[in-house]
């Protein structure tokens, strides 16, 4: 049984509030429609319910891609991970739980957001719960919320000390996604090539704040490196 997760979290206020409000309103409307369809039909497999669920999943995909574009363009908000000391501290906190809370497969620390892929080292019962849960509900699973709270809470405190500031460091919400069967390689490449995509480096191996698990490096090595 495998429940490898692709998680993206970002700095507070790094997406325009108008964009966030629009997404929240549309998402809430679709969720309400889903509840109504389930209540009316008493069947979560009805054609109407299935159609609405597909629309919700499509909305979430579109929102992820839009956020990724806004983050790469650094449209608004802070870019604290441009400071090497801050980026190092974030990377250090991702490594800290490797082998204890999860098996860390990859990450990329960008100027205002982080992509990471890991497999939680949890009970088979919790793994089953993760696999059953819709992506948007993953953050509410106690075992996962504890992991993310540990990563984000400690790194926020340490980074704020470096920056001599107080206040929110990370946005509360994150993008959480269970990697589907056969999509693992694609997800790893997506994460590692984030800095390549926006022209920071030519090969992912050259980016200081990229990480790939040792056993996977040869599999994903850049052709030109």
Residue ranges and their predicted role:
Residues 1-225:
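Short catalytic/metal-binding and nucleic-acid-binding patches
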């Amino acid at each position: 049984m495998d429940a490898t997760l692709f998680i993206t979290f970002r700095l507070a206020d790094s997406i325009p509030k108008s964009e966030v409000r629009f997404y929240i309103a549309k998402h809430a409307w679709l969720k309400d429609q889903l509840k109504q369809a389930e209540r009316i039909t008493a069947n979560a497999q009805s054609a109407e319910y299935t159609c609405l669920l597909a629309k919700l999943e499509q909305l979430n995909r579109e929102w992820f891609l839009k956020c990724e574009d806004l983050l790469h363009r650094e449209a608004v908000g802070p870019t604290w991970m441009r400071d090497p000391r801050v980026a190092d501290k974030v990377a250090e906190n991702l490594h800290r739980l490797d082998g204890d809370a999860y098996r860390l497969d990859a990450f990329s620390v960008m100027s205002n957001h982080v992509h990471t892929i890991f497999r939680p080292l949890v009970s088979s019962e919790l793994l089953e719960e993760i696999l059953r849960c819709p992506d948007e509900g993953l953050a509410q699973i106690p075992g996962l919320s504890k992991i993310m709270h540990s990563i984000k809470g400690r790194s926020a405190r340490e980074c704020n000390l470096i920056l001599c500031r107080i206040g929110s460091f990370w946005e509360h919400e994150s993008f959480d996604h269970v990697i589907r069967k056969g999509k693992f390689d694609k997800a790893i490449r997506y994460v590692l090539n984030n800095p390549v995509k926006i022209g920071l480096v030519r090969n992912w191996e050259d980016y200081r704040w990229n990480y790939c698990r040792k056993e996977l490096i040869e599999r994903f090595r850049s052709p030109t490196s």
